[in-house]
UniProtKB/Swiss-Prot annotation:
Thermostable. Displays an activity half-life of 1 day at 52 degrees Celsius. FAD binds at S27, E46, V54, W55, Y56, W57, D66, Y72, V119, Q152, M446. Optimum pH is 8.0. PANTHER family: L-ORNITHINE N(5)-MONOOXYGENASE-RELATED (PTHR43098:SF3). It comes from Thermobifida fusca (strain YX). Belongs to the FAD-binding monooxygenase family. The gene is pamO. The record marks R337 as: Transition state stabilizer. Its cofactor is FAD. Its EC number is 1.14.13.92. Keywords: FAD, Flavoprotein, Monooxygenase, NADP, Oxidoreductase. This is Phenylacetone monooxygenase.
Length: 542
């Protein structure tokens, strides 16, 4: 199941740098670019064989972004904004990876990256206020600052079904897909998981496979993407005001041009509700989540919108029994990540597609021949695991990160992640996270969050060097206040009611803690700016 790499040579990392960055996805590349611009010595360590991060590994058929391409891109370079032309409303994985490569080539970023290399440990030296970082190749690098740009969805979560290693057929995980095309023609294929990757990959497999079995435990809410080619005239007009357009997105709750409807879903008639939601449905995309101001705050308001979507599913899938099993129930709409689908529900009208409800007939074991549930065995040629990721903390915990007093980050966060502003954590000086727990992160346009975080962290590092300071550490009391604030705001919404990867519920044994800041990107950005303006209030600088 290992993914193949694409760059053959391995660059020897330097022994000492001002800043070491872990990860060469969108976050790490921008950190590298910006620190170079600020005149600091910087190097990036990356496990993969090339740039791309999540878009390097997730090459499964149908993979695409759920943020519109014109907003899911860097805004720091006017040249890049003008030179690159997106072709679709929602860019596919190959196009996003081409874009990342375009940026890496344009700014010669690969010259500052060591590929094929995994950071295994990082320890803070209190005597020198530096980090000592070890890799799986025996490299040891000393850095004043350590930036974790290791991604929110970079550690695939494998199911703990007995017998998984005994399966004799082809086994794939959507989060670590082969680089060469996979042909499912004539095969009996099983897909386990119906989150974002499962809903994206299944319709593509259904076009090839002789038979497709979709193993579903929890139905998800999915709405039409209405993906389409972008009009060249539209792009030309947009580029005349692209910088202004992107700045507007930085002043919104989600970091995109999605605006909250002013009305309550409880104050409108059935006719008005259906008319409004139908308009969003036909337009496609996730904006239906913002159709009314109380969708994510009031259970009754949420239920009215949820039932509209359930009826859409019932009206799409011809078999009423299958349709009802696909209808999400038992949790509020939008509290799991809203999925954009292309032909997913229509797929179940195909004769070669079968839904297996594992709530009523749980998977008991993986056999050499396929999947056995409590009812029967399904013989398969290929099995696709669309079982998600150990989100937000998974990549951090794969590294033995030790701070003051040799305390491990994994130990400090044993009951759940604790950060100040999502940027740093007390007891771990000179360590910064990009789009980590306690920040808007995955609840926002990731590119907007990434740029804001990278700019804040690199500005802070520049401030430290300018003022002859060598140690920046979050104050524990401020961290506690921030965690309390994050939880208070989350508790004003319906999010914590639902078991999701936002709360770590998809990983056995992981603490159930809501890990994201739901107060809005614009509000979060303002808080971070105020902290910086006050001489980095909440940090002890020495």
């Amino acid at each position: 199941m290992a993914g193949q790499t694409t760059v053959d040579s391995r660059r020897q990392p330097p022994e000492e740098v001002d800043v070491l960055v872990v990860g060469a996805g969108f976050s790490g590349l921008y950190a590298l670019y910006r620190l170079r611009e600020l005149g600091r010595s910087v190097h990036v360590i990356e496990t993969a064989g090339d740039v791309g991060g999540v878009w390097y590994w997730n090459r499964y058929p149908g993979a695409r972004c759920d943020i519109e391409s014109i907003e899911y891109c860097y805004s720091f370079s006017e040249e890049v904004l003008q030179e690159w032309n997106w072709t679709e409303r929602y860019a596919s994985q190959p196009e996003i990876l081409r874009y990342i490569n375009f940026v890496a080539d344009k700014f010669d970023l690969r010259s500052g990256i060591t590929f094929h290399t995994t950071v295994t440990a990082a320890a803070f030296d209190e005597a020198t206020n530096t980090w000592t970082v070890d890799t799986n190749h025996g490299d040891r690098i000393r850095a004043r600052y350590l930036i974790m740009a290791s991604g929110q969805l970079s550690v695939p979560q494998l199911p703990n079904f007995p017998g998984l290693k005994d399966f004799a057929g082809n086994l794939y995980h959507t989060g670590n897909w082969p680089h060469e095309p996979v042909d499912f023609s004539g095969q009996r294929v099983g897909v386990i998981g119906t989150g974002s990757s499962g809903i994206q990959v299944s319709p593509q497999i259904a076009k090839q496979a002789a038979e497709l079995f979709v193993f579903q435990r929890t139905p998800h809410f999915a709405v039409p993407a209405r993906n389409a080619p972008l009009d060249p005239e539209f792009l030309a007009d947009l580029k005349k005001r692209y910088a202004e357009f992107r700045e507007e997105s930085r002043n919104t709750p989600g970091g995109t041009h999605r605006y909250q409807g002013p009305k309550s879903a409880l104050e409108v008639s059935d006719e008005e509700l259906v008319e409004t939601l139908e308009r969003y449905w036909q337009e496609g995309g996730p904006d239906i989540l913002a159709a009314y101001r109380d969708i994510l705050r009031d259970r009754d308001a949420n239920e009215r919108v949820a039932e509209f979507i359930r009826n859409k599913i019932r009206n799409t899938v011809r078999d009423p029994e299958v349709a009802e099993r696909l209808v999400p129930k038992g949790y509020p709409f939008g509290t799991k990540r809203l999925i954009l689908e292309i032909d997913y529900y229509e797929m179940f009208n195909r004769d070669n597609v079968h839904l297996v409800d594992t709530l009523s007939a749980p998977i008991e074991t993986i056999t050499p021949r396929g999947v056995r549930t409590s009812e029967r065995e399904y013989e398969l040629d290929s099995l696709v695991l669309a079982t998600g990721f150990d989100a937000l903390t998974g990549a951090l915990f794969k590294i033995d990160i030790r701070g003051v007093g040799n305390v491990a980050l994994k130990e400090k966060w044993a009951a759940g992640p604790r950060t100040y502003l999502g940027l740093s954590t007390a007891g771990f000086p000179n360590l910064f996270f990009i789009a980590g727990p306690g920040s808007p992160s995955a609840l926002s346009n990731m590119l907007v969050s990434i740029e804001q975080h990278v700019e804040w962290v690199t500005d802070h590092i520049a401030y430290m060097f300018k003022n002859g300071l060598t140690r920046s550490e979050a104050v524990l009391e401020k961290e506690d206040e921030w965690v309390e604030h994050v939880n208070e705001i989350a508790d004003e919404t319906l999010y914590p009611m639902t078991a999701s990867w936002y709360t770590g519920a998809n990983v056995p044994g992981k603490p159930r803690v809501f890990m994201l800041y739901v107060g809005g990107f614009h509000r979060y950005r303002q808080i971070c700016d105020e902290v910086a303006a006050k001489g980095y209030e909440g940090f002890v600088l020495t």
